[in-house]
Amino acid sequence: NVPVVPGETLVFFDEIQSCRNAISSLRFFHEQYPELHVVAAGSLLEFALSEIPSFGVGRIRSMFIYPFSFDEFLSAMGEEELLRVKNEASLISPLSDLLHEKLNKLLKEFLVLGGMPEVVMNYAVKRDINECQNVLNDLIISYKTDFAKYKKRVPSLRITEVFNSVSKQSGSKFVYSRTESKSDIQQIKTATELLMMAGLVIPVTHSSSNGIPLGAEANRKKRKLLIFDTGILQRLLGFDIRDLLFQNDFDAINKGAIAEVFAGLEILKAMSCYEKNDLYFWQREAVSSSAEVDYVLQIKDKVIPVEVKSAKKGSMKSLFIFLEEKKSEYGVRLSMENFSSYKNVNV
């Protein structure tokens, strides 16, 4: 009994992946009722879309929505002023020690909680981080239950095995044979592609990074894979969250490459939501001088290397090798440090 007023009412189809007819009806709304605003959302939606022969090409606009970013988390926690100060800080005007310490504390909380809306909402209201772990566990169970809906494509057990294996191989090149089931590599590859299609697993592809676009020199046989949320990741790995919350050095915080995953996800969330963006890394394999840079960004016509480092120490050998070889203007180091610079590296 709710009136539908064109131009004023927003019709929202949630969990639309459960009904193929509802997905197909989106084309009707565009052609027959264009003045009505319609939004559709669903989990593992890409799985369902791949099973529909034609899906409103040119009539439907897609948005790629991710869990909360760290900035959005700060806003949800009511830390608007802290967020403003953080975003206004720079190399020449860093944060005060007090605010820097507070931000690091909130960052560690965010690494544990992740950005799933239900988790963030629960924490914003109750501030009970242990209860949020239960919410994360429930979300993981829900995702794995949803995998069963796509057993016609590949057994749901294979999808679950790959999902678990991605978490264990975070921070290194993904090796199919390291999944629990080693008997059917093709099924494992199919399950991996499905998880990437659904956005639950984010690929980071090797690029030689000699120029732009980075994708022109991508080697898709060399990939790292990221779980889409750090909260989900730490639950899959069974971390003792006290290790993440109370350690002051990044080595402890970077268990399971969680800091590297966080950095990649934040880079992705900062990009346009109207296209499916790609992440790249660089690696040089040489007997006497191997090197690896965690992420490589294309910013306008520049190629910028990004390294995630531990604590307030650590060599930047790989970063400097990249800067020298690729003649990049500057590099970026991400750590628990305040804003600063060292030679041609921004911290």
Model segments located where?
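Catalytic cores of nucleic-acid endonucleases
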Residues: 310-346
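A short beta-strand-to-loop transition that corresponds to the Sensor-1 phosphate-sensing loop
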Residues: 15, 41-46, 66-68, 230-231, ...
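Sensor-1/coupling segment of RecA-like P-loop NTPase cores
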Residues: 31-53, 195
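Accessory nucleic acid-recognition modules appended to NTPase machines
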Residues: 120-291, 297
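Active-site beta-strand-loop-beta-strand hairpin of nuclease catalytic cores
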Residues: 297-305
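Conserved P-loop NTPase "ATPase switch" module shared by AAA+ and STAND
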Residues: 3-22
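Structural recognition of the conserved hydrophobic beta-strand(s) that form the central parallel beta-sheet
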Residues: 12, 37-43, 64, 73
